[in-house]
Amino acid sequence: MNIAANIADDPETGDIDDGAGPALFADAPRSVSFNKLRKRLLRQVRQAFDDFDMLKGQKRWLVGLSGGKDSYGLLALLLDLKWRGLLSVELIACNLDQGQPNFPKHVLPDYLTKIGVRHRIEYRDTYSIVKEKVPEGATYCSLCSRLRRGNLYRIAREEGCDALVLGHHREDILETFFMNFFHGGRLASMPAKLLNDEGDLMVLRPLAYAAEDDLARFAAAMQFPIIPCDLCGSQDGLQRNAMKDMLADIERRMPGRKDTMLRALSHVNPSHLLDPKLFDFSSLGVTDPS
């Protein structure tokens, strides 16, 4: 498995003609650099599909759309793959309006209607619950995320979907790994494919191999109508920000280390760790020389 940024040319993805693609690509840049970026992201999504068998038994997906660069990018790439005949799954875009102050309610439905994507926008005032439960000065993100996830599961079931598809990328996975490493005392990250606790829905992250910088460039070029993620006034947790800064510093000092770290997560050697639940150390013994 090669998860470096420059994956070898994929003949099935093919060349991209200027202006080619689904409706949302109508105003996309006509440049070699953008086409290379687009093709790289498409290959990385397809590689995640293959590596984690994401398409097995899948007919309909609920695509979580927050209004941020990552979820917009995810939706665009999935639509691009459908346009190319490389993805047969039906897509439903979904945004959960959580009652955050100043949330621009018109942005997502207007955009999704314009590009002709089936969608569902639902209002659930989880913001008031978070305000009530979280102490003053603490970050809302963790509880807000859990409440959002529960509602998205419900909506996925109501829409007859097989999976909830989310826009987490390479950096999200690495940051989660180091948060668990430094603060949780365990080796765990954010899986690319997960069966929910009830066992009736998959959670898929097709952008697992995609770099955040690439997604930011893609979003800027596509001119997605971005909705800021800090409308509630809360900021990302200090722990995650510290991990983000640490990873950025490592990448500046030693370019390419993020790809190396991500590759390490798929090359685990239990016999060289310290968990007897993963490896039977009691079975080891010195060979009798006689």
UniProtKB/Swiss-Prot annotation:
<comment type="function">
    <text>Catalyzes the ATP-dependent 2-thiolation of cytidine in position 32 of tRNA, to form 2-thiocytidine (s(2)C32). The sulfur atoms are provided by the cysteine/cysteine desulfurase (IscS) system.</text>
</comment>
<keyword id="KW-0963">Cytoplasm</keyword>
<dbReference type="GO" id="GO:0051539">
    <property type="term" value="F:4 iron, 4 sulfur cluster binding"/>
</dbReference>
<keyword id="KW-0004">4Fe-4S</keyword>
<keyword id="KW-0411">Iron-sulfur</keyword>
<keyword id="KW-0694">RNA-binding</keyword>
<protein>
    <recommendedName>
        <fullName>tRNA-cytidine(32) 2-sulfurtransferase</fullName>
        <ecNumber>2.8.1.-</ecNumber>
    </recommendedName>
</protein>
<comment type="pathway">
    <text>tRNA modification.</text>
</comment>
<dbReference type="GO" id="GO:0016783">
    <property type="term" value="F:sulfurtransferase activity"/>
</dbReference>
<keyword id="KW-0819">tRNA processing</keyword>
<feature type="binding site">
    <location>
        <position position="232"/>
    </location>
    <ligand>
        <name>[4Fe-4S] cluster</name>
    </ligand>
</feature>
<dbReference type="InterPro" id="IPR011063">
    <property type="entry name" value="TilS/TtcA_N"/>
</dbReference>
<dbReference type="InterPro" id="IPR035107">
    <property type="entry name" value="tRNA_thiolation_TtcA_Ctu1"/>
</dbReference>
<keyword id="KW-0479">Metal-binding</keyword>
<keyword id="KW-0460">Magnesium</keyword>
<dbReference type="GO" id="GO:0000287">
    <property type="term" value="F:magnesium ion binding"/>
</dbReference>
<dbReference type="Pfam" id="PF01171">
    <property type="entry name" value="ATP_bind_3"/>
</dbReference>
<keyword id="KW-0820">tRNA-binding</keyword>
<dbReference type="GO" id="GO:0034227">
    <property type="term" value="P:tRNA thio-modification"/>
</dbReference>
<dbReference type="GO" id="GO:0005524">
    <property type="term" value="F:ATP binding"/>
</dbReference>
<comment type="subunit">
    <text>Homodimer.</text>
</comment>
<dbReference type="GO" id="GO:0000049">
    <property type="term" value="F:tRNA binding"/>
</dbReference>
<dbReference type="GO" id="GO:0005737">
    <property type="term" value="C:cytoplasm"/>
</dbReference>
<feature type="short sequence motif" description="PP-loop motif">
    <location>
        <begin position="66"/>
        <end position="71"/>
    </location>
</feature>
<keyword id="KW-0808">Transferase</keyword>
<keyword id="KW-0547">Nucleotide-binding</keyword>
<feature type="binding site">
    <location>
        <position position="144"/>
    </location>
    <ligand>
        <name>[4Fe-4S] cluster</name>
    </ligand>
</feature>
<comment type="similarity">
    <text>Belongs to the TtcA family.</text>
</comment>
<dbReference type="InterPro" id="IPR012089">
    <property type="entry name" value="tRNA_Cyd_32_2_STrfase"/>
</dbReference>
<dbReference type="InterPro" id="IPR014729">
    <property type="entry name" value="Rossmann-like_a/b/a_fold"/>
</dbReference>
<keyword id="KW-0067">ATP-binding</keyword>
<feature type="binding site">
    <location>
        <position position="141"/>
    </location>
    <ligand>
        <name>[4Fe-4S] cluster</name>
    </ligand>
</feature>
<keyword id="KW-0408">Iron</keyword>
